[in-house]
Regions:
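N-terminal [4Fe-4S]-dependent radical SAM core
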Residues: 1-37, 81-84
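Short loop/turn segments at strand-loop or loop-helix junctions that form parts
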Residues: 39-43, 50-54, 91-94, 150-156
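Conserved aromatic-histidine-acidic binding/catalytic patches
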Residues: 28, 32, 36, 94-97, ...
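Short low-complexity stretches enriched in small and charged residues
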Residues: 5-10, 42, 46, 70-74, ...
Length: 156
């Protein structure tokens, strides 16, 4: 995508199911899991020289939270129409915790967890947010069957 394209406002709910990559992992927990890997934005509060240039952006070009929620609903609707009812969402960026609606996105995903066979969420983060933020994160992920974090080590 070019810089001229306002991808932060792109309506991802219009993507046909056949263009969404899904992975059924029968060896993982013995069920098909629809996996979504989502880069929530390029902004990162660290500017490490060894990180990929995409993630060293100062641009806070996050998609609007409401559009993210609609996209989640559409992905799940299409996945369910195609026989999936177990989901794994992997959220990264830049630094995903700086998406202004990150906790809202988690709460939206969690609200549907009871209606699924299995729902998990994973975050790759530099863990730079304060403890109050992480306390809110812990509360937001309680409804999930599983939640995990990969902490990035930053030596610069």
């Amino acid at each position: 995508m070019t810089e001229d394209l306002k991808w932060s406002n792109y309506d991802f709910t219009k993507i046909p199911f056949d263009d969404i990559v899904s992975v059924g992992q029968r060896t993982l927990l013995y069920r098909d899991i629809f996996t979504v890997s989502w880069l929530l934005g390029r902004f990162c509060n660290y500017k490490c020289s060894y990180c990929w240039p995409y993630a060293r952006s100062n641009r806070k070009d996050h998609r609007p939270t409401e559009l993210c929620l609609k996209t989640i609903d559409e992905i799940k609707r299409q996945a369910r129409e195609n026989g999936f009812n177990s989901f794994h969402f992997s959220l990264s960026g830049g630094e995903p915790t700086f998406h202004p609606g990150y906790l809202d996105i988690l709460q939206h995903l969690a609200a549907d967890a009871a209606n699924t066979n299995y729902t998990s969420v994973h975050m790759t983060s530099n863990c730079s947010r304060n403890m109050v933020w992480f306390e809110q994160y812990v509360e937001a992920v309680k409804p999930f069957h599983r939640a995990s974090i990969t902490a990035s080590l930053h030596t610069e």
